[in-house]
Each structure stands twice: as C-alpha cells, then as structure tokens.
Amino acid sequence: MATKKAGGSSRNGRDSAGRRLGVKKADGQYVIPGNIIVRQRGTKIHPGTNVGLGKDHTIFALIEGRVEFLTKRNHKIVNVKEIAST
C-alpha cells in the first residue's frame, strides 16, 4: 500500500475587488450639481472652481455646467464652467 503524507494547504489565492476609481465625467461633458467627476485616493486631481471635495477625495459638481480639466504648476485641476445663458 502506497503512503503519502497529506499536502499542506496554500494560504494564497485571494484578491480584493477593484475599487472603481478614476475619471467619471470627461472634459467638456455636461454635469448637474452632485454629479461625481473623479473618484480617487488622495488628491491626484485637485478641485478648482464650482466643484466640491468629499472626505474620500471624490470631486463632484456644485453647479450645472461643463467639466474642464487643466494643469497649473504641475497640478491637475478640474473646474465646472457655467453654461452661458442666452
């Protein structure tokens, strides 16, 4: 009769689900107040005018308008430009 010692169990083989981070509204896209523009860890992109910053560093629109991304002094900034009423 063949004998074989029981194999040890592996402690690997797990992974956490992705956190769905990133830009949710592109440059020039229309937003309404409360729309999430960017989900991020830390302020990789900084808030500009007419946007708010959540406690988890989520950037969201405060007014109705169009999203605008720009770079100032090596900082990426996101603004919401108000749509001119005609």
Swiss-Prot record:
SUPFAM superfamilies in the record: Ribosomal L27 protein-like
InterPro entries documented for this protein: Ribosomal_bL27, Ribosomal_bL27_CS
Gene3D superfamilies noted in UniProt: 2.40.50.100
GO MF terms, alphabetically ordered: structural constituent of ribosome
Gene: rpmA
Domain of life per record: Bacteria
Spans annotated as Disordered: 1-24
Biological source species: Rickettsia conorii (strain ATCC VR-613 / Malish 7)
Protein name: Large ribosomal subunit protein bL27
